């Protein structure tokens, strides 16, 4: 069996550790590099020690050298770091799975451009359930008649730094596009004070941050006399790690191009 060599950026973070644990359980994958920032206290340690099973892969901050021999880099870090890693991968011909959120429109264009040379799966949420949720939102947004107010509510742990979440924004994009709208023109991010009546055809976003919530997302379609709620709740980061590794396997057969989890799961 030919093993797929996986490098993990942000390897000592919550997602990084979960991804490495999941790689260790897979028969067809091998952890080829564990990467961190230059000031990380974990540098030069065995990455497997973080998950209880030493593996001989040393945590490194030199991406250019550490990525030698890797097929795919999985990156759940922050936008600035991801773009730096992207430049190295593009130059080295290494594919990427990007789960980082919080990119600006201009930063997303950089990712789109890099996909001319390498294959990239770029998705705000890697879980199977959330990507089925996106399809259900298309069905609801298309089937429900005019007059239903749309609100998106998301909740995450206290450490999440961007709001609304990338998944919530993608939910809004799916609904807006299905209804022939531009999300930038109809989105309402939070409400405070005397706001007046709710404007028709807008999409509201509400954000909750607290504790160790892995990720809850709800789309509320509120009509007169009834409301429809479509909800996904993640109870473990393992679901995101498993999805990211599915994405890495998907990229093994690609030369270049930009994909998302709808492509990986055959939903498009």
UniProtKB/Swiss-Prot annotation:
Keywords: Amino-acid biosynthesis, Cytoplasm, Diaminopimelate biosynthesis, Lysine biosynthesis, NAD, NADP, Oxidoreductase. It holds the Pfam family DapB_C. It is found in: Cytoplasm. (S)-2,3,4,5-tetrahydrodipicolinate binds at residues 157, 166-167. GO terms for cellular component: cytosol. It catalyses: (S)-2,3,4,5-tetrahydrodipicolinate + NAD(+) + H2O = (2S,4S)-4-hydroxy-2,3,4,5-tetrahydrodipicolinate + NADH + H(+); (S)-2,3,4,5-tetrahydrodipicolinate + NADP(+) + H2O = (2S,4S)-4-hydroxy-2,3,4,5-tetrahydrodipicolinate + NADPH + H(+). This is 4-hydroxy-tetrahydrodipicolinate reductase. The gene is dapB.
């Amino acid at each position: 069996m030919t093993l797929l060599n996986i490098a993990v950026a942000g390897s000592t973070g919550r997602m990084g550790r979960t991804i490495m644990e999941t790689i260790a359980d897979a028969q067809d994958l091998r952890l080829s590099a564990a990467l961190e920032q230059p000031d990380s206290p974990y540098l030069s340690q065995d990455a497997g020690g973080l998950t209880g099973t030493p593996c001989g892969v040393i945590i490194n901050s030199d991406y250019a050298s550490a990525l030698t021999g890797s097929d795919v880099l999985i990156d759940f870090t922050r936008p600035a770091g991801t773009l730096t890693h992207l430049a190295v991968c593009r130059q080295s011909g290494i594919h990427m799975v990007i789960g980082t959120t919080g990119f600006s429109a201009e930063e997303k264009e950089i990712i789109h451009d890099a996909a001319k040379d390498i294959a990239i799966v770029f998705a705000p949420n890697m879980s199977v359930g959330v990507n089925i949720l996106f399809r259900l939102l298309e069905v609801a947004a298309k089937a429900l008649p005019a007059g239903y107010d749309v609100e998106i509510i998301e909740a995450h742990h206290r450490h999440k730094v961007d709001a609304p979440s990338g998944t919530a924004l993608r939910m809004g994009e799916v609904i807006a596009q299905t209804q022939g709208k531009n999300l930038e023109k109809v989105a309402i991010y939070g409400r405070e004070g005397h706001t007046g009546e709710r404007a028709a055809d807008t999409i509201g976003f509400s954000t909750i941050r607290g504790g160790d919530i892995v990720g809850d997302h709800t789309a509320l379609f509120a009509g007169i006399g009834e409301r429809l709620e479509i909800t996904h709740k993640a109870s473990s980061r393992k679901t995101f790690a498993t999805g990211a590794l599915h994405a890495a396997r998907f990229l093994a057969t690609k030369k270049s191009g930009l994909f998302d989890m709808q492509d990986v799961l055959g939903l498009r």
